[in-house]
Amino acid sequence: MSRSLTGALAHGFLGQSPLWYKAVICLFLVLNPLLLATIGPAAAGWALVIEFIFTLGMALKCYPLMPGGLLLIEALLLQMTTPQALYEELQHNFPVILLLMFMVAGIHFMKELLLFLFSRILLGVRSKAMLSLLFCVLSAFLSAFLDALTVTAVIISAAVGFYAVYHRVASGANPREDSALDSDQQVAQLHRDDLNQFRAFLRSLLMHGAVGTALGGVCTLVGEPQNLLIGHEMGWHFADFLLKVAPVSIPVLGAGLLTCVLLEKLRLFGYGTLMPETVRQVLAAYAAEDDAARTQAQRIALWVQGLAALILIICLGLHVAEVGLIGLMVIVLITAFTGITDEHRLGRAFQDAMPFTSLLVVFFAVVAVIHQQQLFSPLISWVLTLPAEQQPGMLYLANGLLSAISDNVFVATIYITEVKQAFLNGSMSREHFETLAVAINTGTNLPSVATPNGQAAFLFLLTSAIAPLIRLSYGRMVWMALPYTVVMGGLGWWAVTYWL
């Protein structure tokens, strides 16, 4: 009986995660008290930071909230920080929590409009280079005002929908009836080459779209959660943030869009595959049937969502309220005028954001430990001993390398908090502080496209339903992101070092 209970407990601990991963987390939990008792709080604090970064890097094995949360509960019990310090950290960053709670949910109710736009572009543009550029531009524009995860989710939804239609037709099934999309056994030999080509076509479009969210997300206060966090620390509103980061973000945006076109024209790194004509004919016929069947209520819903999007952009530009409250307004407007009054339908809009919001609380708990143990103070002090003109570039590199393997919100939180403390201590001027803030913001946003771990949108794409269908693996994502990483990361460093 005891063996079965032990086995059940071991199986339930962290669920379907590999046994080696469970063993590593248990080792961390045993190691931390020993380090605290033998070497001291600084060593235990650094161990905690490294362990938490490990959980972020292994996000595909287990969502970091559970293992990271266990580590932080232990840190609280070991008094490496206090519940009061965590509460004050959350209170200080409350606008970011509001953003994730309400803005992401608000954009959820615009999905039909966004899906309509991406579908029209996909079928209306025949040039692959122009189509890729439009996907990248639209993703960048939407991510500058909306939420990158939601924009990525919409692109994925469009891709899954189109893939499902053609896969069913190629399998001899009704395109409007459910079928197994993960098996090619029923696909006629005649259609197999076209299906594989269509997969490569969708892979390239999805990667362009995901990179577009990073290109646009770095530009504005609401583009990424860490932007709002940094803007809040600096006292910047929407227009302030846009102008401060423009010397870096605008050149990088232009270079990223140029890279998109060149990759398609030169057919490098897995890009350049065209949509087979047979696939286009099937999808166009399906879309025409959908248009004919669209009801008046559905058309009105699209207009309401479009008007709400316009109001959202105006309110953000004028900073009429905190970003999260504007998101709540969008929820009220769209649901009130489209007849969404059921509590369960409302609740689904919050499902995507709440896990990450909970994880963000764990981020801030780690930051509270870092503050209490002063872990990053020596590093920041060393950077500040460098000549002033070298400091932005060095911070950019430090942020970029860590953001590529960890979560950029976590990295940005650590660095902006430590640099602000140095500013408050009189170690730099306000102008130099703003320069370093831009370096931290761009350093966490641009080089982090190198791996799926760095960008939430990339990780979301990798773990989505479409990834196995179109054969998009971790390694393939890294390979396809490589040219963007070099261009965006390299030009970003140059701009931070020489143009700020």
Swiss-Prot record:
Catalytic activity from the UniProt record: 2 Na(+)(in) + 3 H(+)(out) = 2 Na(+)(out) + 3 H(+)(in)
Source organism, top-level taxon: Bacteria
GO MF, one annotated term: sodium:proton antiporter activity
Pfam families: NhaB
Mode of membrane association: Multi-pass membrane protein
Ranges annotated as spanning the membrane: 11-31, 34-54, 58-78, 96-116, 121-141, 145-165, 205-225, 241-261, 311-331, 350-370, 394-414, 450-470, 477-497
Record localization: Cell inner membrane
An example Gene Ontology CC term for this record: plasma membrane
Keywords for the protein's UniProt record, in alphabetical order: Antiport, Cell inner membrane, Cell membrane, Ion transport, Membrane, Sodium, Sodium transport, Transmembrane, Transmembrane helix, Transport
Role noted for this protein: Na(+)/H(+) antiporter that extrudes sodium in exchange for external protons.
NCBIfam families: PRK09547.1
Assigned protein family: Belongs to the NhaB Na(+)/H(+) (TC 2.A.34) antiporter family.
Protein name, as recorded: Na(+)/H(+) antiporter NhaB
Organism the protein comes from: Pseudomonas putida (strain ATCC 700007 / DSM 6899 / JCM 31910 / BCRC 17059 / LMG 24140 / F1)
